[in-house]
């Protein structure tokens, strides 16, 4: 079991460890699992970069930073998070001096290319607008958080529709400005969404 855990952690394409964690809980009822290996799995399952071990290799550090990023992104779905906030949460400010913007963008792009994050980079405001992020561990607490976020989103949409029906000038102006915005404003710089769609069709050429 220890080998299976290590292989999953070191697999560059694996970012969700909940099923493996649950499997380990069942296996432990009949045979012990090395506590250090199990603790490492728990960190990759629901921990963040603050839990990293100094004994790990660089690849494990990078993966845990990506997982930390999507945790942060999940708290900002439908809104934006600053590069500065990402820099601190991923502890990138503790790395040797380099261009912080480049470093933050590197992790964002890695998350997007691995299809665990969908969003837009605004180069002008140095922010990431989050559309979607992978859920790492779904328990009752996380489900309650998601319900709360969904309720807030529905409330915001209802308020916008109410203002539109009322013909609120400020909303009309915002929509007019939005229609004039283009990629030159930095809004549509870097958009990745490779998730499969139910209506996707393969064509043989």
From Swiss-Prot:
PROSITE patterns: PCI. InterPro entries: COPS7/eIF3m, PCI_dom. Keywords: Phosphoprotein, Signalosome. GO terms for cellular component: COP9 signalosome; cytosol; nucleus. GO terms for biological process: protein deneddylation. Signal peptide: none annotated. The modification Phosphoserine is found at residue 183. Residues 1-135 form the PCI domain. Component of the COP9 signalosome (CSN) complex. Component of the COP9 signalosome (CSN) complex that acts as an regulator of the ubiquitin (Ubl) conjugation pathway by mediating the deneddylation of the cullin subunit of SCF-type E3 ubiquitin-protein ligase complexes. Belongs to the CSN7/EIF3M family. CSN7 subfamily. This is COP9 signalosome complex subunit 7.
């Amino acid at each position: 079991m220890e080998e299976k855990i290590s292989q999953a952690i070191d697999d560059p394409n694996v970012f969700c460890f909940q099923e493996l964690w649950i499997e380990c809980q069942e296996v432990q009822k009949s045979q012990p699992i090395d506590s250090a290996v199990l603790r490492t799995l728990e960190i990759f399952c629901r921990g963040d970069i603050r839990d990293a071990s100094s004994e790990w290799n660089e690849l494990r550090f990078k993966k845990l930073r990506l997982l930390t990023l999507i945790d942060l992104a999940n708290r900002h779905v439908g809104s934006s998070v600053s590069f500065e906030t990402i820099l601190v949460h991923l502890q990138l400010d503790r790395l040797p001096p380099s261009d912080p913007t480049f470093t933050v963008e590197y992790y964002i792009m890695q998350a997007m290319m691995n299809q665990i994050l969908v969003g837009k980079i605004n180069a002008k405001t140095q922010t990431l607008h989050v559309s979607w992020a992978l859920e790492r561990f779904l328990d009752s607490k996380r489900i309650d958080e998601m319900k709360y976020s969904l309720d807030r989103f529905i409330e915001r949409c209802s308020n916008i529709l109410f203002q539109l029906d009322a013909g609120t000038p400020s909303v009309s102006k915002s929509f007019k400005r939005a229609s004039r915005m283009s990629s030159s404003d930095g809004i549509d710089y870097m958009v990745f969404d490779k998730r499969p769609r139910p209506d996707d069709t393969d064509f043989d050429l």
